[in-house]
Amino acid sequence: MIRVYFVKDMGEHLMSLALRSIKISRYLGLSQETYINKVLERFRMKNCSPSVSPIVKGDRFNLDQCPKNDLKREQMKNIPYASAVGSLMYAQVCTRPDIAFAVGMLGRYQSNLGKDHWKVAKKVMRYLQGTKDYKLMYRRTNNLEVVGYSDSDFASCVDSRKSTFGYIFILAGGAISWRSIKQTMTATSTMEAEFISCFEATSHGVWLYI
């Protein structure tokens, strides 16, 4: 390639699109600590106290938490909720599958957010404050086998009674693809919700294989 095109050697690749690669012995790590610090600073959460979890069992989101009149909607207009969710989503898509469920829930209320939704968004940022040094780690191996897992709850959406499912695929000891999203159809049983989750995960696994 060097003989055909002009190529400039910039040395070993360490940083790209807010992703930092770290080599440790037989492992390669991907980190977004620098990006997370910028997000925390942007939303004035740089010195916030850390949270142990982005969301806890029993947390519920529904349309009743949204503003019911124009006055309350006007009060929420100055809150940078959509920007915060978008920033969290970029971290989630790149290196943080552990916040996929929470960010997915927050994204459902961008058009009419309530104070409770903003509190949870800040809670996710507090969680990132305490875990910003987390990395996706991949080990050198001759066995490049993709392993996938899927799961689903049942009728967790209070408004639509639809279930939320998720899947994750592992390669070389680290996550390479993941998703958490509300199902498009209403499952009538836990078994049906799990079957839908398994189908979606299998379809994505076939795509990864191809």
Predicted regions and their residues:
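Long, low-complexity, charge-biased intrinsically disordered regions
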Residues: 1-210
